[in-house]
From Swiss-Prot:
It holds the Pfam family BrxL_ATPase. It comes from the Viruses. InterPro entries: BrxL-like. This is Uncharacterized protein 440.
Amino acid sequence: MSGNQQTNSQLFEKLKSHSFFYNPRDNERILSLILGEKQVEENKKIEILKAYKRGIDSQYFSANLPYYNEIKFISKITGFKVKDDLVIAKFQNGFTGDFDPHEIADNPDDFYNLISSYMFVKIKKGSENWFIDEIFSIEPPNNFEIAKEILEEADKEHLTYAVLLQAFGYDSQKMDSDDIFLTLPRLFPLFKSPITKRQINTIEISNRGTGKTTTFMILQEVFNFRYYTEPPTYANLIYDARNNMYGSVFLSNGLIFDEIQTWKDGYAVKELNSINSTLSTGIENCIWTRGAGTESKSATIQKCIPIIYAGNPFSLTLDKYQTPDIESYLQQYEIFTPAILDRIHIIQLAIKKTYDKIINARVLYPSILRALVELIQEKINRTTNYADCGNLESRRKEQSIDIQIVLQALDIDLQIGKVSNEEVCNKIVNLMRFSNLGGW
């Protein structure tokens, strides 16, 4: 084995030693998500799993209420408001209660960072209602020590892209260059451009069984993206005016809209157009408004978050002898407007390898994975070299810069300065608007 091969092997073994099997159908994954590498007794694991089920399953939670005077559950806050110095929060299981924010954090910055994490909640039965007796975040702090060791080794071998894929359960050693370039964009929304300050937004229309949903579940559970398989309401997405509660935009780090090929079924065109208008403004200006007629300041939220759209192709509409025009093809998906498409960095219409050919399902423990992504973002922030794609118009030109910066930080050599800008830009444009659906 050569020196490089041995080093690579050691790097991937290190990743493996700090990872766990991630199966989105296995509820026991919560143990790895909140405990990390910490070992606990079997009876403690059973308690945690029951608390988690009570925290995410509203029917199971309700079934517990008549039997106990005290209930413990593990859940995330899905909406909240502040009233009389108390936080009134709604949880995944439907329970709503108030608590002193000092129970979660001593200062507003820490509270803001922790409000979207998994919470341990103990509630007690009062004379009239159930109330929150205890609440605190149970997510372990980011492990920068291990993440730094991994990234430093990856930097030496110019394998940051491979480490990132491996960290999310892909098997980068099985993947060819096409697989890598078709898969990496799923993770780009984790990063922000230091040049344009934009988040990276993507659309992926691809065949089933390629690992999309598994990746989206990791983004949801580890990085607090909000995952939708049907169109959101204004109340859920931005602000619930009836209950005066903030929605997903405030509480999440990104939005994922999956199964979009089904969204036109049973959803009023007028409602969809209103949501589209809100999304278009939010993507571009980081301003999210509750909707027409809402005057309160609290109904307008300023926050920059990335958006991922995903779905499956309408196979019966394809011309098997011709690759479809991307934007014309996307008109079949009623969620897309020209304004939204103009704000998307990368659009893929692709037939990809199925997950059994590119995935090993071993995911870095969340405390290390979050730290690794932060460190890669720092590397992105230090990357300033890019080719000037003068043939592109303003927004598309800025998007090409964002993608170049991220790719270089991931150790993808774009040959900037070695080949013409035109050659670099052509490659970036092909990545930004990719289709291989012709002939399917």
